[in-house]
Amino acid sequence: MSLRQYFVERDPFTSRAFFPVFSKEDLTGPEGVERLVAVRNTEEIMGVALNTAFPDVEARYKAFMGRLTRPEKRLNVVGLGDVGGTLVTALKLLGDDIREIGIYDPNESLCRRYEMELNQVLDREKPVIRILDEAELFDCDAFLFTASRGVPPLGAAGDVRMLQFEKNRDMLKTYTKKAREACFSGLFCQISDPVDQLSRCVFLQSNRDENGTYDFAGLLPEQVAGFGLGVMKARAAYMARRMGVNPSTLRAYGPHGAGLVIANSPTEYDSDLSDELTRLTASANREVRALGFKPYIAPAISSAALSILALLRGEDFHGAIPMGGVYFGCVSKMTPAGTVVRAEALHPELETRIQKAWAELKEGEASCRT
């Protein structure tokens, strides 16, 4: 598909590298959460806007789209802990259009176990599971990062996701450097917590040269996506059913944790009901922890496996995407010209809540630059 190209120059810290153009107004349109209410006809793409603030943006855009449009993709997964192991299992069962899943973990026995067991699943020849060497990590179409340091023990107080931030941010530096050195042109899927903040770290870390100067020659903002919102939507639906509320009109926005926004409806918004749904959804993981288990099955399947496959297939997915200098959770889909968010009319109170959640992420963005 050949698209007309429009060249723009925007601040690379807060803007997209490429995006679909449906009308000339898009060339000067907003970058933040205002996009969620910018309702317009998105049936026919007029072209693609390329941001020249990113070096060689045209070639990098084409390389990325070349990866995403391959009929059978190769995925590499780093980290075979609770989430990673469940994710690989789900991808094996659901990924008919995935050719190969590469797996990597410092624990070689874990790698051997998953390679043996998942390649012995009856009548599931694809995807093939293969153990990776470290040098092969970024030889793929999508890189899935689930590794985590310092997962809080059962009974830990506070937002257990944010307790992992500094250790996981520092661990990521090794991998973002490798992605930069490999000139990685695929999709970097950030799965370990806190998803939204770490997605921003991935983008920023990869775009520093050896002197620490930002040159924006690493990953494009669209090459990074965070996967934590899917399970929040699923948990909200579960809680709604328990309350006798129809889950079909539910909406989920924002981060996977503090700042999450669950709405009972985009237009028939009930603030009290939505606040209660948000509270129950945000604390759902603690219900599982109270039973003596770590809550990793639903996140690995809903936030990671199903959402990543939906993105790769060009379907609507729940995930954190670049939005005005942060990675913000919403429903969007990947097109040949870039990401299109689900824009719709929103109740004014809901719009205010979303703006507040975005502003809180923006306030904490400085910690992503360390």
Where on the chain are the PLM-derived regions?
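Glycine/serine-rich phosphate-binding loop and adjoining beta1-alpha1 elements at the start
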Residues: 1-74, 104
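Rossmann-fold NAD(P)-binding glycine/threonine-rich loop
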Residues: 2-14, 153-217
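Long, compositionally biased stretches enriched for glycine and/or charged residues
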Residues: 8-30, 240-370
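Conserved beta-strand elements of the Class I
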Residues: 76-78, 189
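Conserved S-adenosyl-L-methionine
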Residues: 93-100
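Conserved N-terminal Rossmann-fold NAD(P) cofactor-binding segment
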Residues: 100, 104-140, 149-152
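Rossmann-like dinucleotide-binding core of oxidoreductases
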Residues: 192-267
